[in-house]
Amino acid sequence: MSSLSRVLRGTFNTCPIRRFSSAATVVSEPTAVTAAISPPQKSLTSLVNGERNPKRIVEKFKKACESERFRTNIAVYDRTVRRLVAAKRLHYVEEILEEQKKYRDMSKEGFAARIISLYGKAGMFENAQKVFEEMPNRDCKRSVLSFNALLSAYRLSKKFDVVEELFNELPGKLSIKPDIVSYNTLIKALCEKDSLPEAVALLDEIENKGLKPDIVTFNTLLLSSYLKGQFELGEEIWAKMVEKNVAIDIRTYNARLLGLANEAKSKELVNLFGELKASGLKPDVFSFNAMIRGSINEGKMDEAEAWYKEIVKHGYRPDKATFALLLPAMCKAGDFESAIELFKETFSKRYLVGQTTLQQLVDELVKGSKREEAEEIVKIAKTNDFLKLKLNLPSQEE
């Protein structure tokens, strides 16, 4: 049975009777007395955030959830789920989120939608779907809020076809009217499944439904166009934003900077960067990475290195993408000395750099008869006290 069929079946086979999960007894809300003697929310949050052992994180989180105030802390829920996902402990994600069903908060749509979203961030779409199906049993209404959370959960789980199916089927079944957030989620899903033309076509549908495309709508389409090499389409979307007086933000500028960089349009790129600064917005590391990319694409390594220095001058730290651009480009240009110095800087200043990027550096050094230097990099990557990486040293024959 398809995911959509299971959702629809669950949607219409649940009875709207006040019933809570049998997995746990419903916990009543704290009285004024118990609230007064409960640990402060800040200390509970610190206990959870400060723990590093996944099992202990779960234990402390579940204990902290007994506090009503703690259960309103969206950030700590999000952070805890992300940490458990990073540790590949999805069963622990399920444990802490299923624990929430014993609280009456689950009868509030906002709280239920949050749990659906968290399951989505963990890629656990079936659990998200189950929470959505169970909402009527908890006398919890399902409006566009929880509908959007479900769409997002499937998108984050990369079930793009299901997002499209749910968007087309559920609103009519549940008497829900999709809003601009619904459309934005669908557009993101279509872009991520390489259906850019269908995503762009939704602009007309949005307006025909009496809705107004917002900055998220346009930024999604703009970035997807430039990333997929559809430069002219990206320029059309940019022009439409200007025509409709959409308030352009830093992400809009960064998307177009990337598009111009990929096309090696240096003059337009520099002009747009100047326009960005004149607008009152502050360029960020993504802006500078685009400028670095543009310089590299035109073979101007001196300019690329100058833009790199601007990142720190503007109060930012270079990211993995910065080094993924610069290190291979330096090697390609035969400037191994600069590449080695940049590598050393990443570790001395504790900048994050990807393992794939460093492996490329090692490979290029060996090809360039710099085996001794390559060996040093492999050793530093393995023995440093910041970011231990296992790099492979190519054999002499390779």
From Swiss-Prot:
The keyword Transit peptide applies. Residues 1-19 form a transit peptide. PROSITE patterns: PPR. Its main location: mitochondrion. It is found in: Mitochondrion. It holds the Pfam family PPR. It comes from the Eukaryota. InterPro entries: Mito_RNA_Proc_CCM1, Pentatricopeptide_rpt, TPR-like_helical_dom_sf. Component of the mitochondrial ribosome small subunit. This is Small ribosomal subunit protein mS78 (rPPR3a). It comes from Arabidopsis thaliana.
